[in-house]
Structure formats: C-alpha cells, structure tokens
Amino acid sequence: MKLRILGYTNIYLLTFVFLFNINLNSQEEEQVFEEVIVTAEKRDESLQDVSQAVTAITENEIEAKNITSFVDLTAVVPGVTVAKNEGYKTVISIRGVGFETNQNAIAAPSVAYHMDGIFIASPFSLQTDFLDVERIEVLRGPQGTLFGQNSTGGAINVISKKPSTDSLSSKVQVTSGDYGLLKVSSSTNFPISDTLATRFSFSSVRRDGFSENIQLRQELDDANSISLRSDWIMELSDTSSLRFFAQYFDSDRNGAA
C-alpha cells in the first residue's frame, strides 16, 4: 500500500513540473498586434489613443465578415442599428438616436454619413454598396464639433482605397449563391507617372427574389444593382496632394413583400 502511494506522488510531481514549463514558455512568447490608424478626430492616430467611442472595421474584417452594405453593420458594431424603411430608405440609429422626424426625402438624419471625410446629405445615398473600401469608422455619441450638423447620435465615415503610384495592381472577386445570386467586383490601380495615379472600381449584384406576388407573378425582395467609381490623385509634394473621385450607383428592385 505504501509503495503505491509513493509511486502516485512521484507521477503527480512530474506532471506538475511539465505543465509549469509549458506555461512559462508560453508567457515568454511576444504577441504582436496590428496597429489600426483612424481619422476619427480629423487626424491620423492610433485607435488606442482616440478619446472617443470608435469602432474601426479594417479591410480584412470587411472581407472575412462579408460586410457589403450599411445594413451589415448592425451585426458587427455595438450600439448601431441599421434597417430598411419603406422598402427603399436606410435608417441608421446609434445608441437609440436616429431619425427624429417622419420619413421623407428631405428629413435630416441624426447620424452623419461621410465618404472619405465628405458629408453626404441625402439619406438615399445609404443605399449604395460598399465599393473598394479600406476602412469603416463608426463614432458613437455627439460629433458636432468635428463633423458638423446631423451628428447628434454619431457619425460613420467610409474610407475608400486611394490610388497609388507604386505599382500596377488588380483584384477580381466573383460570388455566387442561392436564389441565383451573382456578385462580381473588381478594382484596378493604374500608376500613370511618379506623381499621378488613378483607380477604377466596379461592382455588380444580381439576385432573384425571396418571395413572389402571386397575383402579378412578380418576384419581390430581389437585388439588381451596379456601382462604379473613378478615383484620381496627384502628388503635389511630400506633404500635399490633389484628389478627385466620382462614384455612380444604380439600383432597380421590385421592393419588399
């Protein structure tokens, strides 16, 4: 009986030492975190240094989580609710603050939408698909000091990829799925000279409807949209540049059931 107890004790001590060595080695390994640079306060700074409640969604997260429109932000950004209203308008609320008037074409929202730092006044612009996006910044809480009017609830800034004079590059993505879904997106960067470059992006989405109007024999909840973007940049000096971009979006849908 004593021999068995001693044998058990020895095994226990050896196991303890083995686990202790594993934990000690794992703590010695250095963990490297990617630094996220945001422009939430109108200047480039690390996300950890920002004194506001900010959620930054990087390009890798956008692709991994399949974030294609504003509606998808509801699932990934805390305190943000995005919904379709009246079948065609997109309504954004942050911490419960959103539209405070009846829905119409001239109603002023309480969450400001900015594209590359430029205020987009029309709420109908929220229908656009995300096209060639580098980062999405969501700022919660009043932002009137830096982002002006219509930002009582917060602000959303969508930052697109800038043209680069470094090298020629191109990217194409094709997605298919149920209900005849076919999505094609592409982006190409053209360096024209050492100081001038352009970037062209394209996206097309086609999908059959989820439901059908039996009387009219018409599919509802379908998707049929196209997005185009042309972006130009000229490097004037090491600290200044001139940028011009234009984006076109067209959507033709039968509406919801």
Feature map (PLM): residue ranges:
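Soluble periplasmic/extracytoplasmic beta-strand elements of cell-envelope proteins
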Residues: 35-39, 53-58, 81-83, 91-95, ...
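Non-catalytic regulatory/gating segments with a bias toward low-complexity or hydrophobic composition
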Residues: 54, 62, 73-74, 136-141, ...
